[in-house]
Amino acid sequence: MSQDLEQKLWSIASGIPFVSDYFLQASPARKLKKENLFSKVFETYFLELGSGWGEVAIAMALQRRNTGFVLMEKKFDRIRHTIREIEKHSLDNVKILCVNFNWFLADVFEENLFSEILLNFPDPWPKKRHHKKRTINSKFIESLRVLLPEKGKFSFATDYGPYARKTIRLFRDSEIFKPETMEFRLERKEIPVSHFERKKRKEGKRIYYIDQILIRK
């Protein structure tokens, strides 16, 4: 990424689309730390990448009040809906970053901040010429290494088998992650079902769940 392009992207990423107490603001000058995410410090922190309509994080935040949830989402309509749900439930443990996480991720947060990171159903870019646009690659895995502590967990879901297989190979080759139990599974009960996931299940799609644990920094 050229310096000019990086500056342009940061000028976008450091802005906020509208006024809300639930926004966090990214900055190239300083990384976000646990002390300046919320009005209080939580026991653990959870990051959802591409949080969509917020239904997964909202459901988890209601059950895990001692965890701070940070959501990264770029689409304004989804962000507005999420904020309405946060307000409806009077949640003090959910904040949103209106940032494209494919631009900046490890640059935004301090190291070892999140005990868990979730990525549900990113675009699989099925055509070979588009594979370079996929989120999960060696650079992304390096960002996970920075943001997770040892024994931190990354959870991933996709309904596209070739993407699941490629993801498994990338984590295997990284040598710093290992599967939590198995390389993939076809059911997941500990994370709420999203609207997109429910739709894919109704269509009869097989969903691959991949959970990786960081074993060394």
UniProtKB/Swiss-Prot annotation:
List, alphabetically, the Gene3D superfamilies matched: Vaccinia Virus protein VP39 (3.40.50.150)
Pathway recorded for this protein: tRNA modification; N(7)-methylguanine-tRNA biosynthesis
Question: What keywords are assigned to this protein?
Answer: Methyltransferase, S-adenosyl-L-methionine, Transferase, tRNA processing
Binding-site positions, substrate: K127, D159
Cite the EC number. 2.1.1.33
Gene Ontology cellular component annotations, sorted alphabetically: tRNA methyltransferase complex
Q: What class of enzyme is it?
A: transferase
Q: What does this protein do?
A: Catalyzes the formation of N(7)-methylguanine at position 46 (m7G46) in tRNA.
Family the entry assigns: Belongs to the class I-like SAM-binding methyltransferase superfamily. TrmB family.
Q: What is this protein called?
A: tRNA (guanine-N(7)-)-methyltransferase
